[in-house]
Regions:
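Short, compositionally biased, intrinsically disordered N-terminal export/targeting signals
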Residues: 1-18
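A structural boundary/capping signal
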Residues: 12-15, 24-356
Length: 356
């Protein structure tokens, strides 16, 4: 079940770092200055952002990052990214207490995220030992997704299961969704694929920090040889999965509410905490190599000047134009895109700066 609750095969505190040496001090100072300027009044500007939601801004920031490094997302892939990003956001919304094994969520929730994750695990075990619907047992990923949503708790495996089951209902005929595990890092996520190859694969990792991204840019999925597929579904499975998910949720509501409450009360009374060796620091969805390329690309914009404009004026002008283009690529009008332009630029800087 991925990052499971166990005393064996514990997930590492943080995964292996990629080689990403820091930027030169002068370049980094310039970079950080622009970041601080963009972020200083971000909450106030975001309230005026109009029609772009936070997930839209995050995805537009990724599109901007790709453009900045000279590797823009192909137009035909953007609708799939947008759809996948919506699934990522929908999945995160199903876990109001946060991730059960991520330090920041544990702290904010005062360990409630860990208690709900453990309760979800315990309820699932009880179902396996009891008389759960056959569909929840013959398809463990579906069962895991239904239980995780019901208990509102999980680790990466629960998040990946929910994303997989939600996304299958959105697939076009040529698309498929896959539940994937890393062979070495103890991490699970979902992928949206088309027949064109790995370079078109989109990673849906709601447990990680960031939007849906192309697999080539991701922290865990970039090398397909290091991963294994545990479940594959296509568009024809959508209606069946939707029906079985609804039936499973109804079964839990009618039969498992007292059981769930009992587990949660017990765990709270015991002051259950996730074992320290199983706690992860927040993981960026993108790789260290991608983050470095973004930092370098943005720093190049920051340090360039043309037409007599100052560095800051030129940087602001270029970033705003590219930010507007990124939002328009997601289907937003120019007015909404312009209103959110600085937020999108800030999202790109944050994507480049994400650290563990």
């Amino acid at each position: 079940m991925g990052c499971t609750i166990s005393t064996t095969n514990n997930a590492p505190h943080s995964p292996r770092q990629e080689d990403a040496p820091p930027l030169p001090p002068q370049t980094r100072q310039s970079f950080v200055g622009v970041v601080n300027g963009l972020l200083s009044d971000l909450p106030k500007r975001r309230r005026r952002g109009g029609l772009l939601s936070d997930p839209d801004i995050s995805l537009a920031g990724y599109l901007l990052s790709k453009a900045v490094i000279g590797d823009p997302v192909e137009p035909q892939d953007i609708p799939r990214l947008h759809k996948a990003n919506n699934t990522v956001q929908e999945t995160r919304a199903r876990f109001p207490y946060g991730r059960g094994n991520v330090a920041t969520d544990i702290a904010v929730s005062d360990h409630a995220s860990s208690q709900h994750a453990q309760a979800a695990h315990d309820v699932f075990v009880d179902l396996v030992r009891g008389a759960a619907p056959a569909s929840m047992l013959t398809n463990p990923t579906l069962g895991h997704a239904v239980v995780s949503e019901f208990v509102q708790g999980g680790h990466c495996a629960g998040y990946a299961a929910v994303a997989t089951m939600r996304h299958v209902q959105k697939l076009q005929p040529e698309e498929s969704v896959h539940y994937v595990q890393h062979n070495h890092q103890g991490h699970d996520w979902a992928e949206s694929r088309v027949p064109d190859g790995h370079h078109k694969t989109i990673v849906l990792d709601p447990w990680a920090q960031g939007p849906a991204v192309l697999a080539s840019d991701s922290r865990f999925a970039a090398n397909a040889q290091h991963t294994q597929e545990r479940l594959a579904l296509n568009a024809k499975d959508g209606d069946d999965i939707a029906a079985k998910t609804a039936a499973g949720a109804q079964y839990l509501l009618e039969n498992c509410l007292p059981l769930t409450e009992t587990h949660l009360k017990r765990l709270k009374a015991q002051e259950f905490h996730c074992a320290p060796e199983e706690v992860w620091q927040p993981q960026p969805v993108v790789s260290d190599a991608f983050r470095r390329r973004v930092r370098q690309g943005l720093a190049t914009l920051t340090n360039s000047s043309e037409l007599g404009l100052s560095q800051s004026e030129q940087s602001s002008k270029a970033l705003k134009k590219m930010s507007i283009k990124s939002a328009c690529a997601l289907g937003f009008g120019k007015k909404a895109a312009s209103a959110a332009a600085e937020d999108i630029a800030a999202a790109a800087y944050q994507l480049g700066e994400q650290s563990q």
